[in-house]
Amino acid sequence: MRKTLITRMTAIAALCALLMTPLTTATANAAPARPATYHGHSLFRGDVLGPDDYLDSAGGNFILRMQTDGNLVEYWPGAGWKVCWASNTNGWPGSYATYQGDGNFVVYTSGGEPLWASNTVGGGGSTVDISESLRDYGSLYVGFTSIHYAC
C-alpha cells in the first residue's frame, strides 16, 4: 500500500514538473488551434461554419462539417462515415460557410471569395438542416430547398 502511494506521489510530482517547464520556442510560436464549434441541429441566417465546425441532424445520424481543407461535407457516421454530399471545394484551407440573410448558403475562401453557393437567394425557410424523415432520410436543406436528396 505504501509503495503504491509513493509511486503515485512520484508520478504526480513528475507531472507537475513537466507542467512547470517552459514551452520550447517552436511550440510557443505556433498558432493556437481553434476549437471546433458545434452548431446544434440547425444553422440560422447569419450563422457561420468555420473550419472544423459542424452541425448534426435532429437524431444525430448525419453531420454537416466545414472541413479544414475547405470542403463542406455531409457524412453518415452510422454507415461507415459515408459521404452523402460535398461542395467539392477542397484545396482552400481556412474557408468557411455562411447562411446569408438573403437565403443563400455560400462557401467562401478565407479571403472572402465565393467557392460554392446553394443559389437559394429569396427562398423560403430560415435554417440549414438535415432531414431524418423516412421520405428523404439524410437530405440537406437550405430553407425549403433540398440541396441533395437522401443519403
Where are these regions (language model features)?
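Secretory targeting and sorting signals
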Residues: 1-30
